[in-house]
Amino acid sequence: MNIQFQGGINIAIKIPKAKYEATVAFYRDTLKLDVQEREIKNPTVSRTHEVKFGPNTVWLDCVDNYTHSETWLEIQASDFEGATRYLASKGINTCDELEEIPADTHWIMDPAGTVMILRQQDTKYTL
């Protein structure tokens, strides 16, 4: 099995509601980055802002029930289904119950608990 992985362009920062406005202002007003609020239909994320961060996109997600922030990453695979089986053989199982996502993606976690969205390389992930 010759599966290749590479980092994706999307980075999500899950932010507690009490710190959300200050965090958005930091990226927009202090760092002067391009920050745009985007519509989101997700039961666990109440608001989201897209931040252009060099070649990457940082998603500032307001999560009402969080007490601290978390950073979630994107990982792409050359063979999505094969990668899912390969990761399971290494003890890395999907955890799609974390948050609603498209059917052709999975949530996984590294051993330290960093959440990653796994998707097929060369496909576009949309909210």
Each predicted region: which residue ranges?
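Vicinal oxygen chelate
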Residues: 1-7, 85-127
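N-terminal beta-strand motif that seeds the catalytic metal site of vicinal oxygen chelate
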Residues: 1-24, 71-73, 122-127
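Mid-chain, well-packed structural core segment of small domains
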Residues: 69-88
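Amphipathic alpha-helical segments
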Residues: 18-35, 87
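Short hydrophobic/aromatic beta-strand element in the GNAT-like acyltransferase core
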Residues: 48, 74, 105-107
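Short secondary-structure junctions
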Residues: 32-40, 92-98
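Conserved short beta-strand elements that form part of the metal-binding/catalytic scaffold
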Residues: 34-71, 115-122
